[in-house]
UniProtKB/Swiss-Prot annotation:
Description of how the protein assembles with itself and partners: Interacts with TRX1 and major capisd protein/MCP.
Any one GO MF annotation of this record: structural molecule activity
Disulfide bonds: none
Protein name in UniProt: Triplex capsid protein 2
Pfam families: Herpes_V23
Localisation per UniProt entry: Virion; Host nucleus
Swiss-Prot/TrEMBL keywords: Capsid protein, Host nucleus, Virion
GO cellular component, one term: viral capsid
Highest taxon listed in the record's lineage: Viruses
Gene: TRX2
Amino acid sequence: MLTDKTIIVSLTSRLFADEITKLQKKIGSILPLQDPHKLQSLDTLGLNAVCSRDVFPDYVHMFSYLSKCTLAILEEVNPDNLILTRLDPSETYQIKNVYEPMFQWDGFSNLTVIPPVFGRQQATVTLESNGFDLVFPSVVPSDLAQAIIGKLLLYNLYSRLVESDPEINIEEVNMYTTNVTHMGRHYVLDINHNNPNEALKSLDDLAVYTCILSALIPRACLRVLTILMRHDQHELLDVFRGIVPREVYEIDANALSIGDDITRMTTFITYLQSLSSIFNLGAKLHLSSYASETQTATCWISYC
């Protein structure tokens, strides 16, 4: 049934029978679109625009793309068009767990839409009839998505270290950065030949924010620890006060006026927020129910 959230993607040629079969197995999955318009062409659908088979994938760029594009559910496959439902906040939708590799969902899962970091080939349905690769994203638990972007940045960081220091063992770098573990299972990330451009820009930002925070943290730490001393404080505060370097306690907290002190604390909090923005994964899907027999979930979307 067509609604005001329906998006119709027109095809340039009729789909072959085997292509229809492959796409029907993907019904209920999430696909990104460049725009929210109701009528669109095939080249706006999926990740092919940022994940071409001819170039090394820039996964950080894809993360950014996914955080800005329109997300929709594949609802219907016809020989001449594809029907999708746009995901809007404050509405509930039905999606299906039809991704490779498949991660277990439950009725309380928070999911994140991420690039096909487990391999472009298994995330792609090639439509020879239209001369187009329809590249699907992966949908994984949000904590796993956080781990993946961390591994991706670390891989690009330590790959540069290997280039400058031949003593560093690349195999050891790969062992720690090119796989993730979830619920006791190991998954290999296809990041050995990724395009590092956007990852390095993110690492530049990380370095800048870390430098600024390193200058602000000692005084901020002292202020927070001393001001929060009280009868009903968190029981772990005493424990963690003991791991703070001695030189922090030697800072003269009264050397600045209260105005300058508050300004520094404001800057500290601002840059903490800026640092976290590097790892912002965009939209999240919150499940309210999941039926493992049909692999169908009811969810709503948020962008915070």
